[in-house]
Amino acid sequence: MIRVITGIAHNAVTVKDMDESLRFYTEALGFRRAFDIDRPETGEPWIVYLSIRGGQFLELFYGGTVDNPWNDALIGFNHFCFEVDDIHAAARQVQDAGWPLDVAPKLGADGNWQAWVTDPNGIRIELMQISPESPHARFE
């Protein structure tokens, strides 16, 4: 089988409050606002692209109005996981930006360090520092 997928270009979420979401992703996680796209039909704001690094983006869509609380029983989306170089520095940055950690840095069952925070839209975010001994580092 030919591997046709070369990477994850972006993930997208619809947000309740764009300003608060931008503050979380830029101040707490350090993403950079890359560019905006307006609706072609109306010229109204539609999508804000945040640069994670190296061609990886998070799309934030304006206009969420219905809560979808995270729940293990739901089928489909569960959480985002973002890789970090230093789990403790990343956790401090999140807290310094005003967001409480749901789970402080700890060693996970996979051998990687992890910490958890919830974004302003109720989306669970896992921060992960990959250990050289973990299955993630050894794969491929």
Residue ranges and their predicted role:
Residues 17-19, 73-75, 80-124:
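Vicinal oxygen chelate
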Residues 59-61, 116, 126:
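Conserved beta-strand in the GNAT
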Residues 53-57, 65-67, 85-89:
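Short, charged/polar surface micro-motifs in flexible loops or helix N-caps
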Residues 50-54, 117-120, 130:
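Active-site beta-strand termini and strand-to-loop segments that position acidic
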Residues 1-20, 77-82, 131-140:
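N-terminal beta-strand motif that seeds the catalytic metal site of vicinal oxygen chelate
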Residues 60, 69-74:
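Helix-adjacent hinge/juxtasegments
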Residues 32-40, 105-108, 112, 132-135:
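Conserved catalytic-core motifs of GNAT/GCN5-like acyltransferases
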Residues 14-57:
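Core segments of cupin and vicinal oxygen chelate
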